[in-house]
């Protein structure tokens, strides 16, 4: 079967890889001149299945107000009066119950754990290198309240058989030796030893090269306009004024999926703006060995080979991609606070990207009411974590194979209930 994949970020490229592996003829279309040049370009770099959690959680509305009042606020909302933003926030509020939080988190952990297994297998099969490390993730708490909140999530980890350790301040160096000098600032940490890190863009570029060697066609610089719908099916995608046709179509355009599907499907995905800095390491002994999550600032500090990436923040500002010097200052403060002397903060590469967020948390993967149209979008901050599992799952669905994990609760149909 001939399949067109719209989008060459980590989600689109992994889908293309697994579709080609399943024997399909695959064409990837993207407006950028190469792969992973938007949302996947400089994300936080963590592959953290155990920390897969929905934003919509009990108490979040009140916490959001408190966060926005902080000097280094992890959250900023700019109401724009659009129906899309208002509806998305209302749907998120409806998911802020204990029952829905547990349900959504379980769905996310299921997919994320599966995805990590798929990544492990892909690495074993191909030998792909992307500055990856298998050294776990450590979530740091600065208050007792944060620690107590994490204890409530542990039951989900137990249910999903995810190994973890709760570490007091004195044992944080078991996971991250460089925290020796700052552990007095912390109340403890939650360590997930099976989590991983890696450069998402490097992974995507190299996997795209491998996919091309398998026959996948990558057509860059293509302005994707809209889907041509005829007799209830997609009969082509209009690209740079030309209709390109296939048997099946996959939309993996992150937050921009909404525009392409306008008038075709009502997609509850909203762009949430995040930031990152990447800095060179000047003292390895003072640098992290893997990923550290700072619960206070809602950021991740991740180690690559010779670089540190600090990523996080959340802004609901539509498709505004302007860089904020204030956000850059906050990210620098975090890496200096936890790992002083580890990096050269005068050599900062500053970036912003738009994460495609669903109001309930899990991504939207699978079939749609249109028989030959499929979705692979809405992964939010967890695109890198969930990419391989999402791609493999989607390829199995399109191929009509029995899937390795339950997926009926990950589709677009869940919003019609």
Swiss-Prot record:
EC number(s) given by UniProt: 1.4.99.-
Disulfide bonds: none
Residue numbers binding FAD: 3-17
Cofactor(s) listed: FAD
Keyword Flavoprotein: yes
One example of a Gene Ontology biological process annotation: D-alanine catabolic process
Record-linked InterPro entries: DadA, FAD-dep_OxRdtase, FAD/NAD-bd_sf
Keywords: FAD, Flavoprotein, Oxidoreductase
Keyword match Transferase: no
Metabolic or biological pathway: Amino-acid degradation; D-alanine degradation; NH(3) and pyruvate from D-alanine: step 1/1
GO MF terms, alphabetically ordered: D-amino-acid dehydrogenase activity
Gene Ontology CC: one annotated term: plasma membrane
Catalytic reaction annotation: a D-alpha-amino acid + A + H2O = a 2-oxocarboxylate + AH2 + NH4(+)
NCBIfam families found in the cross-reference section: PRK00711.1 (NF001933)
Similarity field: Belongs to the DadA oxidoreductase family.
Function: Oxidative deamination of D-amino acids.
Official protein name in the record: D-amino acid dehydrogenase
């Amino acid at each position: 079967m001939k399949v067109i994949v719209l989008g060459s970020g980590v989600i689109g490229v992994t889908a293309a890889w697994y579709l080609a592996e399943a024997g399909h003829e695959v064409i990837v279309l993207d407006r950028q001149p190469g792969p992973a040049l938007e949302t996947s370009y400089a994300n936080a770099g963590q592959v953290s299945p155990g920390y897969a959690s929905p934003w919509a959680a009990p108490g979040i509305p009140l916490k959001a107000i408190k966060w926005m009042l902080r000097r280094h606020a992890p959250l900023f909302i700019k109401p724009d009066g659009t129906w899309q933003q208002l509806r998305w926030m209302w749907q998120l509020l409806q998911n802020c119950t204990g029952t829905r939080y547990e349900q959504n988190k379980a769905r996310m952990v299921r997919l994320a754990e599966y995805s990590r297994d798929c990544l492990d297998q892909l690495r074993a099969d191909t030998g792909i290198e992307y500055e990856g490390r298998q050294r776990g993730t450590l979530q740091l708490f600065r208050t007792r309240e944060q620690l107590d909140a994490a204890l409530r999530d542990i039951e989900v980890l137990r249910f999903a058989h995810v190994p973890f350790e709760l570490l007091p301040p004195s044992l944080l160096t078991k996971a991250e030796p460089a925290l020796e000098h700052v552990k007095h600032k912390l109340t403890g940490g939650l360590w997930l030893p099976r989590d991983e890190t890696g450069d998402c863009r490097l992974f995507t570029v190299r996997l795209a090269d491998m996919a091309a060697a398998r026959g996948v066609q990558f057509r860059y610089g293509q302005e994707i306009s809209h889907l041509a719908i005829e007799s209830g099916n997609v009969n082509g995608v209009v690209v740079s004024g030309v209709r390109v046709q296939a048997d099946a179509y996959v939309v993996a355009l992150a937050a921009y999926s909404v525009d392409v599907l306008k008038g075709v499907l009502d997609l509850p995905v909203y762009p949430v703006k995040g930031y990152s800095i990447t800095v060179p390491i000047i003292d390895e002994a003072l640098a992290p060995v893997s990923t550290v999550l700072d619960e206070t600032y809602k950021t991740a500090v991740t180690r690559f080979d010779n670089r540190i990436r600090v990523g996080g923040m959340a802004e609901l500002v539509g498709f505004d991609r302007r860089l904020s010097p204030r956000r850059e200052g906050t990210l620098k403060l975090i890496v200096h606070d936890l790992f002083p002397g580890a990096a050269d903060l005068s050599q900062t590469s500053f970036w912003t990207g738009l994460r495609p967020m669903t109001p309930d948390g899990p991504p939207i993967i699978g079939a749609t009411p249109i028989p030959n149209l499929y979705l692979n979008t809405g992964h939010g901050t967890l695109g890198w974590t969930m990419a391989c599992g999402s791609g493999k799952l989607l390829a199995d669905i399109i191929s009509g194979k029995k899937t390795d994990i339950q997926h009926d609760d990950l589709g677009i149909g869940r919003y019609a209930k």
